[in-house]
Amino acid sequence: MQADHHCHHRRLFLQSALAGSAGLLLPGTVRAANITELSGRVYINKRVARADMPILPGDLVTTSHNGRIAFHLDGDAFLLKPRTSLEVGESGDGLVSLLQLLTGKLLSVFESGRPRRIVTAQATIGIRGTACFLNVVPDSIYYCNCYGSTTLTVGDHVEEFTATRHNAHQVEFDEGKMMGMQVMQVLDHDDDELRRLEASVGRVPAFDR
């Protein structure tokens, strides 16, 4: 019974030989993400994920009630928590520049330089070298600018966020329109998770520098 319990709840941590690199190079110019953490039930394009499976631009990554997956690509690193669905997009140069968070919780750290976006059904987050956490549910978004600067756009409303160590807000919606925003405490993510993500791409968080 104990062995079954351990098997059911085991967590697989992988030390990638390419930690901090751009990612696995596949034939042509397509890049694939390196998976660095995998536990519980996780799916890539509706197939059960394995540690050696690539994550490519256009892929849909989904976690079940007990699933978690972390991966890094092109200097950026991501942690999907349980009950999360994320589509990985790209720009014309083959680099990941767009993430569509359909639902759930996503913690991300980004290399400085080129612009990226996280898109939800209600809002768009504009990013340049920062860390952020999102929890998306049908009528609200919990958003934490962990450090760095980001832009939250909802329709014609644009909100700038800057932080050195966590600036969190809850944004409420009604029929796609923003109805309110309130300051929140740090929820569902922590500094150690940020440290692990940054370490997977050879960096440390801004608050540890």
Question: Each predicted region: which residue ranges?
Answer:
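N-terminal secretory signal peptides
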Residues: 1-9, 19-23
